[in-house]
Amino acid sequence: MDGMEVLERIRKNTKTKHLPVILLTAKSGELDKVTGLESGADDYIPKPFGVLELAARIKAVLRRSERPALQDEKTKEEHALLKKGKLTINKVTREIMIEGQFIDFALKEFELLYHLVKNQGIVYSREQLLEKVWGYDYYGETRTVDVHIRNIRKKLEEKGMDPECIKTVRGVGYKYQAEE
């Protein structure tokens, strides 16, 4: 049984599916890394690696996986609803509505919009958004944020919202400003 099979079993088991998983492997190809991460691994470390790097990555994965103490379901759902103007975001069900109409968002689009709305008025650079939404180990282009913002604006506009509720702050980044 290889690491991918172990990972699959961990993710399928309801008792273990939320455990953080780091794959330590001899496979170092880009496709192997992408496959491992997309299959549910929280991190992927090809051999050889340093002990200090391993320790730092374990600490980072544990930090990200910490969950607040369980609350009753009603309290969770109340805190999960975020309402700004016409926009309602439910963090628990991962649903976004504009005046009662559901909008379908990709996972990162949802997380990006949620982060901006939750922190309304605060300007975030592309790098900060990559760190907050994609995680510390994102190695892609910072322009990824621009593409996602463009997609979010388009979807908001299609449902009658002003796409410029996500403001571009030239030379800095983006912020959310609710419609009046």
Regions found by a protein language model. Give the residues of each.
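Short, Lys/Arg-enriched segments at the junction into DNA-binding effector domains
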Residues: 60-123, 127
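Short helix-capping/hinge SLiMs at alpha-helix to coil transitions
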Residues: 12, 118-121, 136
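Basic, amphipathic DNA-recognition helix from helix-turn-helix-like DNA-binding domains
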Residues: 8-13, 18, 22-83
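Short coil-to-helix segment of the ABC ATPase nucleotide-binding domain corresponding to the Q-loop/switch region
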Residues: 52, 122-133
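DNA-binding patch around the recognition helix
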Residues: 149, 153-180
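Conserved catalytic core of two-component sensor histidine kinases
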Residues: 48, 55, 106, 139, ...
